[in-house]
Amino acid sequence: MSAPRTLYDKIWDDHLVDSQDDGTCLLYIDRHLVHEVTSPQAFEGLRMAGRKVRAPEKTLAVVDHNVPTSPDRHLGIKNEESRIQVEALARNAADFGVEYYSENDKRQGIVHIVGPEQGFTLPGMTIVCGDSHTSTHGAFGALAHGIGTSEVEHVLATQTLIQKKAKNMLVRVDGQLPPGVTAKDIILAIIGEIGTAGGTGHVIEFAGEAIRSLSMEGRMTVCNMTIEGGARAGLIAPDETTFEYIKDKPRAPKGEAWDRAVEYWKTLHTDEGAHYDRVVVLDAANLPPIVSWGSSPEDVVSVQGVVPNPDDIQDETKRTSKWRALDYMGLKPGTKITDIAIDRVFIGSCTNGRIEDLRAVAEVVEGRKVAPTVSAMIVPGSGLVKEQAEAEGLDKIFKEAGFDWREPGCSMCLAMNDDRLKPGERCASTSNRNFEGRQGFKGRTHLLSPAMAAAAAVAGHFVDIREWK
């Protein structure tokens, strides 16, 4: 009888082509997602070597990072570098026979939202993209992670990837989530617990009652930020929630193929007695709504808490780093989180740009107005999310409240397009990174859930969504 295996072990074993004595392995790749920023050099490398894309039907190209989200984006991209990258992807996709969603295609959006909603992402697959937040797709029980540009070329040419196997880590969130606490709070709490290096060298499997209770949108939020916890990838075993989400998606299996697929997918779970190299357990009942205060995703605290004092940290290097973060953020120790006023609100990104996120925002802001001191924007994660939101009348709620309703794209998650913070502006953001300059030069980013961001937009400062009336 074979030894019990984790979910990660099973997917790895199913895709192992070859292994060397030093641990170097060759993995088969089922799906390759491509966007405009990390692919130009890879395609050019193929062109110069006279190679073709080995499996164009397993490759999908989408523009997302550089595209404008303003209503007039059909007039073209003003920034020359951004325009060149977008035009290059369109040309490369055509030259190499890869399916491509342009900014004028309603299926276009952030690549990690597009893949799942098209059924391109399926359980048990290996999925790569030249983007760190490829871990999002792990919500489906797929082994998904980011790769570099040279690796993008390697996968395009061979449909394989050279890797070394990571360690197994389990993060179990027991119990039921309290009202007002979301998937975003779960993953921020996990990163706060283990730190941004806590998952280094590991693939994390998320489990427990609180994880099982999440929708697929919530599970994608959790897996999306696995990389912020230092791990290579995040995984959640597929179940009926997964199957229901995938069923009838454009690229999902149909008929007998569907039945066979589900039969296989049901085997994708960790065996009883399988070994994890590290186990972390959290109690969902103790989780509050969370807000980040510093310039790292591990710098988090309860919305009812205060900005911590770095002098309480024993490690000198870390203490110095946290003082630098406070200086950058313009905050002082002991300041109540609910006393921090904001200038901007960004709701969107591959972390929280899905229809469930927008519904949560609408529930908070309906019949209310954005504070006069705040500029707020909502960017749907894809054209299909935008279409669904408008069919439900959410756009009207947003506009009446004073939000700017945009076109799909990565937008203000990162300062690679027209949507960015001005120096000194403080933003409540549903994105995944609060690094210095991430949303714009000297911009100050606070990470939080969509409902919390929406409430902050109305109040003009952070508020506890549990007390929202």
Curated annotation (Swiss-Prot):
Pathway: Amino-acid biosynthesis; L-leucine biosynthesis; L-leucine from 3-methyl-2-oxobutanoate: step 2/4. It comes from the Bacteria. This is 3-isopropylmalate dehydratase large subunit. It is an enzyme of class 4 (lyase). One of its GO terms (biological process) is L-leucine biosynthetic process. Belongs to the aconitase/IPM isomerase family. LeuC type 1 subfamily. It catalyses: (2R,3S)-3-isopropylmalate = (2S)-2-isopropylmalate. It comes from Rhizobium meliloti (strain 1021). Its EC number is 4.2.1.33. Keywords: 4Fe-4S, Amino-acid biosynthesis, Branched-chain amino acid biosynthesis, Iron, Iron-sulfur, Leucine biosynthesis, Lyase, Metal-binding. GO terms for molecular function: 3-isopropylmalate dehydratase activity; 4 iron, 4 sulfur cluster binding; metal ion binding. InterPro entries: 3-IsopropMal_deHydase_lsu, Acnase/IPM_dHydase_lsu_aba_1/3, Acoase/IPM_deHydtase_lsu_aba, Aconitase_4Fe-4S_BS, Aconitase_4Fe-4S_dom, IPM_dehydratase_rel_enz, IPMI_cat.
